[in-house]
């Protein structure tokens, strides 16, 4: 059984009400429930954290190393374009990760086109709404099992 950590960055706690035309109508609880069930059915353990505070996400990444987490899925949200500290934390623990976004960041404002994570991520999935997380989870399963 593998352990997978899903990290949700700032403002994702507002899913379901924040700009639903961009982010969809599903809540973060809906997404987390579905991911947890999918992981359980595949025989894996899923952990989640949403935070609007960069340091809390960094601390959780550090804890993940101590806990033996096998894989991270992260939607850094607005931190995608600003956080060298989160990038360094992910590199520092050496846990493979997938960068995920609900919207297609490359079809949005120019400042959203740059990511501090994509060049060091196993992969990037964006633009599929909440399905982006499900696709990332399936990719994580494949990487973990080598299939």
Curated annotation (Swiss-Prot):
What's the protein here called?
3-dehydroquinate dehydratase
Domain of life, per UniProt, equals Bacteria
Q: Give the originating organism.
A: Hahella chejuensis (strain KCTC 2396)
**Assembly information from the UniProt record:** Homododecamer.
| Catalyses which reaction(s) | 3-dehydroquinate = 3-dehydroshikimate + H2O
The gene from which this protein is expressed is aroQ
Query: What pathway does the annotation place this protein in?
Result: Metabolic intermediate biosynthesis; chorismate biosynthesis; chorismate from D-erythrose 4-phosphate and phosphoenolpyruvate: step 3/7
Enzyme class, top EC level, equals lyase
Q: Name one GO biological process term.
A: aromatic amino acid family biosynthetic process
Cite the entry's keywords alphabetically: Amino-acid biosynthesis, Aromatic amino acid biosynthesis, Lyase
Lineage, uppermost ranks = Bacteria, Pseudomonadati, Pseudomonadota, Gammaproteobacteria, Oceanospirillales
Q: What is its EC number?
A: 4.2.1.10
